[in-house]
Amino acid sequence: MTNIRKTHPLIKIINHSFIDLPTPSNISSWWNFGSLLGLCLAIQIITGLFLAMHYTADTTTAFSSVAHICRDVNYGWLIRYLHANGASMFFICLFLHVGRGLYYGSYTLMETWNIGVLLLFTVMATAFMGYVLPWGQMSFWGATVITNLLSAIPYIGTTLVEWIWGGFSVDKATLTRFFAFHFILPFIITALVIVHLLFLHETGSNNPTGLNSNADKIPFHPYYTIKDLLGVILLILSTMSLVLFFPDLLSDPDNYTPANPLNTPPHIKPEWYFLFAYAILRSIPNKLGGVLALILSILVLALLPFLHTSKQRSLMFRPITQTLYWMLVANLLVLTWIGGQPVEHPFIIIGQLASISYFSIILILMPISGIIENKLLKWSL
């Protein structure tokens, strides 16, 4: 009798995706973040669903409904902080996942990579809208500042902003639609994740060497299921430590003050995971230029397959580009720091220099170093 997992129409799909999937035998722990992102998404959807049962998307009651969840709902504080800190863990895993793709040349799998970039944009949009929902000071002013950026678009900018707001300022209509979008987007993300995996399993995974691994593949289960399980345990451990010991470590104290349109906070800034992009936005004095730089800071990832000049896929044996890669990582940390600082000297100039070097490393220096390494290895023929 044939095994049911190989014959049943539905179980067969799961079998080919997570059990009998041929996987390179040498993929490291950097390949764990895909499954961890899946776990983060599941946690966010489940906790979000429970929060939505008690939350009210109305400007008069939104803030107090969040307080009610924390005070009166059974384990409401746990659900709320799991959701808030789960977003931070989600972005940590996302950045590490993208960083691994950049280091090991996974962007050469074009379809998978492009869906991944689209996923990154969608997750960022979802997180931004979620930050508006508690209707604290930073929620309100963050929503005002970021949506107002669209007014930089020529001709239709102002109309577009008022259309998104549903009025002449961020108000009840804005909050209601943001809640609706924040609720629906995770399910769209889930659909995109399935497409992401579909494209990945079409070509097979990359590996640290960047070489073809078809000659040496092992089944995903039990080897990588047990390896993923270790990652899952570590993620849950670190998330629960954050939630139970330092729940407000990554949030803004201003968001514990109810939204007040008449009182602007001293420093308007987004959540920590958007600070690098916010720093790039602020580094350009022109409004439209800033918006374009902001979009390009993420969209530049989609250009990576076209900027790949090396004959080698991975950075494993490319010391010059490795150095540039770690310079880029350091640069992003500097941008994250600058994004949280006030707009004054010396932070302005540091932000501008870091923004220039961010785009220079990706668009100019890395492709040049690829060509140099080819020459050094006499592979340019």
Curated annotation (Swiss-Prot):
Membrane-topology descriptor: Multi-pass membrane protein
- Organism field: Rhynchomys isarogensis (Isarog shrew rat)
> What does the record give as the function of this protein?
Component of the ubiquinol-cytochrome c reductase complex (complex III or cytochrome b-c1 complex) that is part of the mitochondrial respiratory chain. The b-c1 complex mediates electron transfer from ubiquinol to cytochrome c. Contributes to the generation of a proton gradient across the mitochondrial membrane that is then used for ATP synthesis.
Mind telling me which InterPro entries this protein's record contains?
Cyt_b/b6_C (IPR005798), Cyt_b/b6_C_sf (IPR036150), Cyt_b/b6_N (IPR005797), Cytb/b6-like_sf (IPR027387), Cytochrome_b (IPR030689), Cytochrome_b_C_euk/bac (IPR048260), Cytochrome_b_N_euk/bac (IPR048259), Di-haem_cyt_TM (IPR016174)
Cystines in this chain? none
Q: Name one GO biological process term.
A: mitochondrial electron transport, ubiquinol to cytochrome c
Q: Give the coiled coil ranges.
A: none
Keyword hit for Mitochondrion: yes
Q: What does the cofactor field's note say?
A: Binds 2 heme b groups non-covalently.
MF terms in GO? metal ion binding; ubiquinol-cytochrome-c reductase activity
Protein name (database record): Cytochrome b
- Quaternary structure (record): The cytochrome bc1 complex contains 11 subunits: 3 respiratory subunits (MT-CYB, CYC1 and UQCRFS1), 2 core proteins (UQCRC1 and UQCRC2) and 6 low-molecular weight proteins (UQCRH/QCR6, UQCRB/QCR7, UQCRQ/QCR8, UQCR10/QCR9, UQCR11/QCR10 and a cleavage product of UQCRFS1). This cytochrome bc1 complex then forms a dimer.
Which Gene3D superfamilies does UniProt cross-reference here? Cytochrome Bc1 Complex, Chain C
Q: Where does heme b b566 bind?
A: 97, 196
Which cofactors, by name?
Answer: heme b
| Residue spans crossing the bilayer | 33-53, 77-98, 113-133, 178-198, 226-246, 288-308, 320-340, 347-367
Pfam families hit by this protein: Cytochrom_B_C, Cytochrome_B
Q: Which residues bind heme b b562?
A: 83, 182
